[in-house]
Design a protein with these regions (language model features):
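Outer-membrane beta-barrel domain signature
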Residues: 60-66, 101-105, 119, 166-172, ...
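Transmembrane beta-strands of outer-membrane beta-barrel pores
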Residues: 45-51, 81-83, 90-96, 134-140, ...
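Short glycine/proline- and aromatic-enriched beta-strand/turn motifs that initiate or cap beta-hairpins
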Residues: 19-82, 234-238, 245
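Predominantly the C-terminal beta-signal and adjacent terminal strand-loop region
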Residues: 174, 179-245
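Gram-negative (and chloroplast) outer-membrane scaffold detector with strong preference
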Residues: 82-160, 171-177, 187-189
Length: 245
């Protein structure tokens, strides 16, 4: 009899404890959500001309000039509080124009940036925000030659010939400022996620000379500056540990 009574009391009390535990966990998650930023993923493109480096290549028929576009991917975080918006991220870009067996060139870069903005709309589903920021972008330009006429035995027997078929690489890096505009939309069914666009301009504070692949300074090296327009599709969601409440 005592066992039966104990079992009944246990069955009555346990749901109450479970409910309190769920409410406590829900409260903790809501509190955590106020402080943790959202994760951002982006895909897009940027447009930039390197006139200084291209001018040097123009008179060398064995090399192809650099493209003025890059495809980009990004990963970062974004936080909105009291309509103030802050975000940080990493962006990689490439012109995707490399052909190892043909005369070609490619430009690629990695960038780090931090931005701040302000939501000018008082709307729960739509966010419109101008933003400004700073960052750093590191570039590598690679030039490939058509080596199809080079004989295999010549490469095998001559270190000079072997070195001559290597692609030519130059590096550069720029501290940059950023200014742009963002627009995002939240779904009523998924208010913790959003989809949106960012577009803007990135400029460098000064011109920088191109360096060797080992980042050595070179005499009479051409100089360029960043004057870049960009546009990105941005997907935003809360961190994975908060996807289920």
């Amino acid at each position: 009899m005592k066992i039966i009574i104990t079992a009944l009391l246990f069955a009555i009390v346990m749901p109450s404890f479970a409910q309190r535990e769920n409410e406590h966990n829900k409260h903790d998650m809501e509190k955590m959500e106020q402080f943790l930023p959202s994760v951002t993923r982006s895909i897009g493109g940027s447009f930039q001309q390197f006139d200084g480096l291209n001018a040097r290549v123009a008179n060398l028929p064995q090399y192809e000039h650099l493209k003025d576009y890059t495809a980009t991917l990004g990963l970062g975080w974004m936080k909105e509080k009291d309509r103030f918006i802050s975000d940080m991220g990493i962006t990689i870009g490439s012109s995707l124009s490399r052909h190892r067996d043909e005369k070609s060139s490619t430009i690629r870069y990695i960038g780090f940036n931090a931005n701040a903005g302000y939501d000018v709309l008082k709307d729960e589903r739509i966010t419109l925000y101008p933003l400004v920021g700073i960052g750093f972008q590191a570039y590598q330009a690679i030039f490939y030659k058509d080596n199809s006429a080079v004989d295999f035995d010549d490469v095998l027997q001559s270190p000079a010939v072997e070195n001559s078929i290597h692609p030519v690489k130059f590096n550069n890096g720029f501290w940059v400022y950023r200014a742009g505009l963002g627009l995002s939309f939240k779904s009523p069914k998924h208010p913790s996620s959003s989809i949106g666009l960012q577009a803007g301009y990135t400029g460098s504070f000064q011109k920088r000379a191109w360096r060797s692949r080992e980042n050595q300074s070179l005499r009479n090296a051409p100089k360029d500056r960043i004057s870049q327009f960009y546009v990105s599709l941005i997907l935003t969601s809360k961190p994975w540990m908060m996807m289920k409440k």
